[in-house]
């Protein structure tokens, strides 16, 4: 059902027009499709961002979000003078560990999920950020945290930014669900825009798998944003050269088909509006599934508190169930959950 919805409206029209492109089977450049990466910058950082206007952003099309994280990891491992460790939230997307270690980076963790409240452990997170060695790379999920579904509030993001500023940490955002979390593209990128506006030097991995339905086309982007300053433009140009050398050695040319589809939608006002409507529909359905699940659990008098199901956001929910409870669901009812007991909400029926 979810994929069928994604192929409706703007995306279906974009695919039809892209199929007629005469250059569809030609190589893209090493940096990817410029019309896509330029539009992707504006989608994440904002079309009026001083960082874009001042040419402090360089962008490369990647093999979806995983490829973007990988390219960023390689860049940090090869060219960051301090060779910092990458600190991941506890828990995080499982593949983060493999991608960064394969790039040759050491890893650390900071507290994130509070098992008792089933919400954000903001005090533990801030303490963990302040305890990390100065200049560490901090991997952050800007929206729809995977796998907990727990996001900081805007006020908490400001506290996180302050703690990172105190320790001169380097933010690395992994943005896989923009527009798919709340249905609002601007709201879902608020944390990124705030950090950029605060003058952080940072990088962003961007995936178009979920919000465009381009799973098999593997379309994404990696962005580096330089801090404002007299050398910002030359710094950005130098980093673009370094990224180009890494991209050439890894994949040479990113895939074209998904890039043309995403670019067509992002650069056509009518298709963009249709796409936004589809995002609101899909994210709204998941929000409704959360409400319905909580209502049914509470109506049946299920022991425990269940407000965390509606407080969390995105495709996954940390249920708070115990290991014996999850085992019972699996063996008796064939309900399967990802360790440690995160449940995908999209497959639920009404």
Q: Which role fits each region the language model picked out?
A:
Residues 107, 171, 202, 336-337:
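Hydrophobic beta-strand scaffold residues
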Residues 12, 16-17, 21-168, 178-193, ...:
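Conserved core of the PLP fold type I
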Residues 68, 216, 258-261:
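Catalytic-loop motifs flanking and including active-site residues across diverse enzymes
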Residues 240-259, 265-294:
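Structural signature of PLP-dependent enzymes
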Residues 1-8, 345-348:
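Cationic, amphipathic, low-complexity alpha-helical segments enriched
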Residues 175:
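Walker B catalytic acidic pair
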Residues 188-238:
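Active-site PLP attachment segment
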Residues 274-332:
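Conserved PLP-binding catalytic core of the aspartate aminotransferase-like
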């Amino acid at each position: 059902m979810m994929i069928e919805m994604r192929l409706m409206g703007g995306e279906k029209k974009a695919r039809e027009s892209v199929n007629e492109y005469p250059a569809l089977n030609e190589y893209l450049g090493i940096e990817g499709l410029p019309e896509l990466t330029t539009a992707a910058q504006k989608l994440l950082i904002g079309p009026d961002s001083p960082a874009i206007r001042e040419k402090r952003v360089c962008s490369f099309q990647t093999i979806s979000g995983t490829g973007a994280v990988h390219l960023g990891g390689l860049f940090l491992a090869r060219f960051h003078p301090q060779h910092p460790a990458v600190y991941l939230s506890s828990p995080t997307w499982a593949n983060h560990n493999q991608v960064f270690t394969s790039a040759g980076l050491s890893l650390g963790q900071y507290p994130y999920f509070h098992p008792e409240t089933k919400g954000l452990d903001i005090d533990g997170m801030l303490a963990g950020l302040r305890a990390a060695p100065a200049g560490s790379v901090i991997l952050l999920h800007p929206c729809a945290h995977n796998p907990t579904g727990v996001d900081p509030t805007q006020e908490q993001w400001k506290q996180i930014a302050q703690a990172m500023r105190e320790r001169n940490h380097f933010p690395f955002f992994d943005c896989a669900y923009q527009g798919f979390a709340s249905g609002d593209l601007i709201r879902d990128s608020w944390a990124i825009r705030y950090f950029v506006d605060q003058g952080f030097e940072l990088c962003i991995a961007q995936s178009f798998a979920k919000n465009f339905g381009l799973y098999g086309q593997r379309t994404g982007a990696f962005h580096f944003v330089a801090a404002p300053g007299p050398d910002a433009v030359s710094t950005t140009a130098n980093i673009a050269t370094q990224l180009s050398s890494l991209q050439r050695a890894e994949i040479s040319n990113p895939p074209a088909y998904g890039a043309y589809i995403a670019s067509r939608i992002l650069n056509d006002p009518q298709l963009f509006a249709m796409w936004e409507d589809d995002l609101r529909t899909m994210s709204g359905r998941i929000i409704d599934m959360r409400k319905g699940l909580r209502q049914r659990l509470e109506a049946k008098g299920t022991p425990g508190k269940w407000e965390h199901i509606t407080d969390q956001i995105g495709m996954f929910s940390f249920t708070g169930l115990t290991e014996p409870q999850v085992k019972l669901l699996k063996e008796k009812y064939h309900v399967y959950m990802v360790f440690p007991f995160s449940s995908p909400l999209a497959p639920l029926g009404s």
